[in-house]
Amino acid sequence: MQVDDVLLSRLEKLSFLKISEDKREEIVSQLSEIVNFVENLSLLDTQNVDEKFAMSNDSTFLREDTAFCDTSINESILKNAPLSSDNFFVVPKIIE
């Protein structure tokens, strides 16, 4: 895939981003490198690689979920809100 200014303009439009003129050449270059890297990955022969292959035989260790709530952080955030209730932001209803 060729990354050029036309493609960058299309990506810019699709992502609702505005890229300044002085950064366009640099971004085209970076995107080209990324695309070339991915194209190189697609050339790898993985025909004989087991689908469940992993670099380590160790299983993923799970940690116990523990709820933690630092109320001082909540208070410092919510004190800047125009309106809050029960540790939540209160916002105007926008859907009928």
From Swiss-Prot:
Pfam families: GatC (PF02686). It is an enzyme of class 6 (ligase). It catalyses: L-glutamyl-tRNA(Gln) + L-glutamine + ATP + H2O = L-glutaminyl-tRNA(Gln) + L-glutamate + ADP + phosphate + H(+); L-aspartyl-tRNA(Asn) + L-glutamine + ATP + H2O = L-asparaginyl-tRNA(Asn) + L-glutamate + ADP + phosphate + 2 H(+). Its EC number is 6.3.5.-. It comes from the Bacteria. One of its GO terms (biological process) is glutaminyl-tRNAGln biosynthesis via transamidation. The keyword Thylakoid does not apply. GO terms for molecular function: asparaginyl-tRNA synthase (glutamine-hydrolyzing) activity; ATP binding; glutaminyl-tRNA synthase (glutamine-hydrolyzing) activity. Belongs to the GatC family. Heterotrimer of A, B and C subunits. Allows the formation of correctly charged Asn-tRNA(Asn) or Gln-tRNA(Gln) through the transamidation of misacylated Asp-tRNA(Asn) or Glu-tRNA(Gln) in organisms which lack either or both of asparaginyl-tRNA or glutaminyl-tRNA synthetases. The reaction takes place in the presence of glutamine and ATP through an activated phospho-Asp-tRNA(Asn) or phospho-Glu-tRNA(Gln). HAMAP family: GatC. This is Aspartyl/glutamyl-tRNA(Asn/Gln) amidotransferase subunit C. It comes from Sulfurimonas denitrificans (strain ATCC 33889 / DSM 1251) (Thiomicrospira denitrificans (strain ATCC 33889 / DSM 1251)).
